[in-house]
A protein has these predicted regions:
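Sec/Tat-exported extracytoplasmic proteins
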Residues: 31, 121-122, 134-135
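Secretory/export targeting leaders with adjacent low-complexity proregions
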Residues: 126-145, 152
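Charged, amphipathic alpha-helical segments
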Residues: 123-132, 237-242
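C-terminal, well-structured catalytic/ligand-binding subdomain of enzymes
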Residues: 23-77, 82-83, 87, 93-119, ...
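Positively charged n-region of N-terminal signal peptides that target proteins for export
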Residues: 1-4
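Bacterial N-terminal signal peptides
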Residues: 7-17
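Sec/Tat signal peptide C-region and signal peptidase I cleavage site
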Residues: 17-23
Length: 357
């Protein structure tokens, strides 16, 4: 009863206008902080591209790779938005709104840089060398997160001309978190401060015990409507409606992907990408390897280069955001979330269990 009253008493806080900017949430987990002794690179993606697909690319560089691409009417593989390659290198990014703005005529090049990195990088140091070699301005304003087969990880907070490196080995608790502000950027500017706290609060016990798993991220974070300022999960309240504000899953969310690196003595072929495509509470993970992508995650839709998994999640998302008039898309039907997410969660757990037998 006390918890329900707290939900009602703080309802007014939810009435604040939601920000229109898209915002990703990400994390790099060291081998020491993970339950299975394998490092993890995770990104909860937010973007205006409503559908994603996975694809393997060969013949464009030194290494073949599997990556996330924007869905479209045609198959375009020029910009990768998260991926892993045959050398055991993985990469992702989150936009950092408190870094210097790009030159107007050359911006939004992050996907091109990540595709190039997957084609030619083996180590974290290789990626820094790539940044050094790229023509300036680079057209980026972002936190690049990278992981390699030796278990090294880092964020590179990067603008058109410079970057600041944060190594995983120096991170308290063996984890690094980034949302949409750079630690090296303008103080108190940017976005995602509450989402950053959401991650810290939800995973506090697992970080302390070194027991994080890929499911902690794709299921524990990407399905959570916890709000750090309120101190509880909205989906656990008895209320039906919530405003889409400062949760990890947002109206603009289109994927949650945890790339599980390799353990000691393993080859890069042992890497697994746990991929949830579409609005994460309305979808489920599929296990992806460097030589195997489930058909539902490929661009196999009759509509064009879209994934069936993402399209199905989009249909279910309509039930979560049923109000179409005015600011309707800002309102979450928590009854629908609870029902749909619980169903998809069970499918995810079955996939995790199947792959780990």
């Amino acid at each position: 009863m006390k918890h329900t009253l707290a939900c009602l008493a703080l309802a007014a806080v939810c009435a604040l206008p939601a920000h229109n900017a898209t915002g990703c949430t990400s994390m790099i987990v060291s081998a020491e902080a993970s339950l299975d002794g394998r490092p993890i690179l995770w990104k909860h993606r937010d973007t205006s591209a409503s559908n994603n697909f996975l694809y393997r690319v060969d013949g464009k560089g030194r290494y073949g790779y599997v990556a996330l691409f924007n869905g479209s009417d045609r198959l375009s593989l020029e910009e990768a938005w998260q991926g892993m390659n045959d050398a055991g290198f993985a990469i992702m990014n989150t936009v950092a709104y408190n870094l210097p703005a790009n030159d107007e005529d050359f911006a939004d090049r992050e996907g091109y840089v990540m595709a190039k990195a997957l084609q030619q990088c083996r180590t974290v140091d290789d990626f820094e060398a790539l940044l050094q070699s790229l023509p300036k301005p680079m057209g980026v304003r972002t936190c690049f997160g990278v992981l390699d087969a030796e278990g090294n990880g880092a964020y590179f907070e990067t603008d058109d001309y410079t970057w600041t490196r944060f190594d995983l080995e120096d991170a308290p608790g063996g984890v690094l978190i980034r949302t949409n502000y750079a630690y090296s950027g303008e103080p108190d500017a940017g976005l995602g401060y509450i989402r950053h706290r959401n991650v810290e609060d939800i995973l506090a016990a697992q970080i302390e015990s070194g027991s994080i798993t890929p499911a902690s991220l794709t299921e524990g974070l990407s399905r959570s409507f916890y709000h750090a300022l309120k101190g509880y999960d909205e989906a656990e309240c008895s209320e039906r409606w919530a405003v889409d504000q400062d949760f990890i899953p947002r109206y603009s969310s289109t994927a949650s992907i945890a790339i599980e690196g390799i353990g000691e003595g393993e080859e890069p072929s042992a890497m697994t990408m746990w991929a949830n495509l579409g609005y994460p509470p309305c979808s489920h993970v599929v296990a992806v390897t460097l030589d195997s992508i489930p058909e539902e995650a490929l661009p196999t839709s009759p509509r064009g280069a879209y994934s069936p998994l993402g399209l199905e999640a989009s249909k279910l998302k309509e039930e979560v955001f049923p109000v179409k008039k005015g600011n309707g898309k800002r309102y979450i039907d928590l009854d629908a979330v609870r029902r749909i997410s619980d169903e998809q969660y069970k499918i995810s757990l079955e996939e995790y269990a199947r792959r780990r037998r």
